[in-house]
Amino acid sequence: PPELMSRFVRPILDGQADYTKGNRFYDLALVRSMPPIRLLGNAGLSFMSKASSGYWDLFDPTNGYTAIHARVASHLPLDRISKRYFFESDILFRLNTLRAVVVDIPMAARYNDEVSNLRISRILGDFMTGHLRNFAKRLFYNYFLRDMSAASLQLVFGAVLVLGGGVYGGVK
């Protein structure tokens, strides 16, 4: 709704955020108005988006109410950002590569008599693939390309140990 615009723009103008997005889960009393299937789906998508984007403190990644600082938008690879349903999740990943500050803006969930055009069976594979791809890219960019640290070594050794343990457990 247009009346929410100032709440989304104010943190950007005040220098507290580069990007703001709506969060329909902020007020637990209002979450009750969300249809159960959407509640479950959004919770699952939120967890996948947290892992792939690196923004662990955000929720409701597919919320389309957003605002972005023009300076940050000018650095986004607009031609590489996913289209359609994965757009919001992919833009969060891209914002993380810019180390942008993203802030959740509480808002009410409003579902009148609208019917969702989203078909889970059609997009589930795209979402899983997109989140796995972005997760791997984020780990590589942040722990190997930009900043090699003890965590980088721990990731390598951890992956080797998990893989080795899985193979050993499978054989035995």
Can you name each region flagged by the protein language model?
Residues R80-K172:
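Hydrophobic helical membrane-anchoring modules
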Residues P2-Y85, N112-R122:
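Acceptor/aglycone-binding surface of glycosyltransferases and processive sugar-polymer synthases
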